[in-house]
Swiss-Prot record:
UniProt GO molecular function: porphobilinogen synthase activity; zinc ion binding
Protein name (database record): Delta-aminolevulinic acid dehydratase
Gene this protein is translated from: hemB
GO biological process terms on file: protoporphyrinogen IX biosynthetic process
Binding-site residues for 5-aminolevulinate 1, renumbered to this chain: R204, R216
UniProt function note: Catalyzes an early step in the biosynthesis of tetrapyrroles. Binds two molecules of 5-aminolevulinate per subunit, each at a distinct site, and catalyzes their condensation to form porphobilinogen.
Pathway: Porphyrin-containing compound metabolism; protoporphyrin-IX biosynthesis; coproporphyrinogen-III from 5-aminolevulinate: step 1/4
Subunit structure: Homooctamer.
Length: 320
């Protein structure tokens, strides 16, 4: 059909008609809110590079989680900030560690889906995501420590564990550890295609996890690559991942679509700290209106993400 028989504007003539033919819808069910929890009590500490985000003590986190649950939030992703760091990241798998305490209380006090970040970078003296020997991040030895972290989170009550380290074979190691200990129903949401991105800087500042030497390019993915992402995702699925993830989201919308179209499995995308801070800065400077938040998240959903991890969740959960 050609003009004038086909007029595309007919389906745009008012908001109700536009809603009827809308192809992509953003829902509260899509959102996961990443939170930072630290030792102490009655602490809610501003994060300078992430306006509107905070480091919470456990009691403050519980209060915030309850408020967000009342507004319709369904899921939360917990990142710990320990008091003590060492070369093995032992605070990460301490049964009385900050994440473990938070998970127990979140499960007692809320009905939220509780997801935990499984990594070592916040917990090690050197800030890398694995065990370091002679300034090299050793892969296979790291796996047993990551498995211990995941198991400790499952024992605390986590619904989902989310390995973010990008070590080869970590999903298999974690799945085997969970199965061996009777946690066969704990979900693994793997950071499958996690790129070595410059958009992580505000997060690293928030959790004090910048590497003491070098960078993470020997284990995180190289930004120019897309077919490599498919190999990473397939390996994680084969090793037992239930949900796969692309991180960051906005510079990698093509990867989200590629992963979703290729595998058709539940796919998460992480709208990371740098994306958040960049948009917040533009809004705060009146360069953009806050309408760009919804537009941004819609682009991630439209690209194929089933789940969106975003620091914007508290701002928009009541809007959608």
């Amino acid at each position: 059909m050609k003009f004038p028989y086909t007029r595309m504007r007919r389906l745009r003539k008012n908001s109700k008609i536009r809603s009827l033919v809308k192809e992509t819808t953003l829902s509260k069910d899509d959102l996961i809110y990443p939170v930072f929890v630290k030792e102490g009590i009655k602490t809610k500490e501003k994060i300078p590079k992430m306006p509107g985000q905070y480091r919470y003590s456990v009691d403050e986190l519980i209060d915030e989680a309850k408020k967000l649950e009342e507004k319709g939030l369904k899921a939360i992703l917990v990142f710990g900030i320990p008091k003590k760091k060492d070369k093995y990241g032992s605070s990460a798998y301490d049964p009385n560690g900050i994440v473990q305490k938070s998970v127990k209380l979140l499960k007692e006090e809320t009905d939220l889906v509780v997801i935990t970040d499984v990594c070592l970078c916040q917990y090690t003296e050197h800030g890398h995501c694995g065990i370091v020997k002679n300034k090299k991040i050793v892969n296979d030895e790291t796996l047993k420590y990551l498995s211990k972290v995941a198991l400790s989170h499952a024992e605390a009550g986590a619904d989902v564990v989310a390995p973010s380290d990008m070590m080869d074979g970590r999903v298999k190691a974690i799945r085997e550890e969970l199965e061996k200990n009777g946690f066969d129903d704990v979900i693994i949401m793997s950071y499958s295609a996690k790129y070595a991105s410059s958009f992580y800087e505000p997060f690293r500042s928030a959790v004090y996890s910048s590497p003491a030497f070098g960078d993470r390019s020997t284990y995180q993915m190289d930004p120019p690559n897309s077919l490599e992402a498919l190999r990473e995702v397939k390996l994680d699925i084969d090793e037992g991942a239930d949900i796969v993830m692309v991180k960051p989201a906005l510079p990698y919308l093509d990867i989200i679509r590629l992963v979703k179209d290729t595998f058709g499995v539940p796919t998460a995308a992480y709208n990371v700290s740098g994306e958040y801070s960049m948009i917040k800065a533009a809004i705060d400077a009146n360069y953009l209106s806050n309408k760009v938040i919804i537009e941004t998240l819609l682009s991630i959903k439209r690209a194929g993400a089933d789940l969106i991890i975003t620091h914007f969740a508290p701002e928009i959960v009541e809007e959608i």
